[in-house]
Amino acid sequence: MGQSEAMGRLWMTWSIDGVGSAGQNVADVEAACRALVGSVERSRRAFDTPEPWEELRAAALLLQDRILGSGRETLDQGRKWASTLSGLSILLIPRE
């Protein structure tokens, strides 16, 4: 799975509208996806009805595809990558 040095460590921040934001170091884009989707899964209790959370979860799964595609390509070039979709925002920054 030939990952470059830039992919070895990432700083990740994300925010969920109406819920909060967080940041952490992750090993690679796959770990970033797990952290993002896991955070959205845990946010379910913050919603009174299932519909907003289901939309948020769908957005997280779409963002996961973006992270594994254009996100990986951008980070491989040593550049930061960000995306926002339906109340969910993420920023990934390569660390040395």
Predicted regions and their residues:
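Short aromatic-glycine-(Arg/Gly/Cys) micro-motifs in beta-strand/loop hairpins
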Residues: M1-S21
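A short, exposed loop/beta-hairpin motif centered on an aromatic-Gly-Thr core
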Residues: V19-R34
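Short, mixed-charge low-complexity intrinsically disordered segments
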Residues: R42-E96
